[in-house]
């Protein structure tokens, strides 16, 4: 079956390529692009349809199950080893929508996760998967002049001023 919706790729230490297809499968190719195997539904029941990120580290495959709001950690046979879900922390806002799209792991084992629409930065986990906080959090620069201009625009609105009154928010992360 052909790949129809490739959403992400990564490779292991042997240069095997892992292709995440949005149709709940991972296709593995060797370094010469020859088919090795396909990893389908995890344990026959856990679906990663529309997953958007994949990463290989230390014999484990990390699959960002965006719609399912978690990250599956599987072995190369497709067996579920663990799951990362939204962390329970006072640093996480109550309205936070955990939608992991990208993941990477540094040489020390720290895990960085990008969540779709998150303005706080990448979620940072320790090597034992304890949530540490946000990495690379954005700031919005606000000056006294911009606040006064915003107040003026609200008090004396017109079309041009209304266009300038859009709420200033930091950009959301899309990749790591």
Residue ranges of predicted features:
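Eukaryotic scaffold repeat domains enriched in small/polar residues
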Residues: 1-176
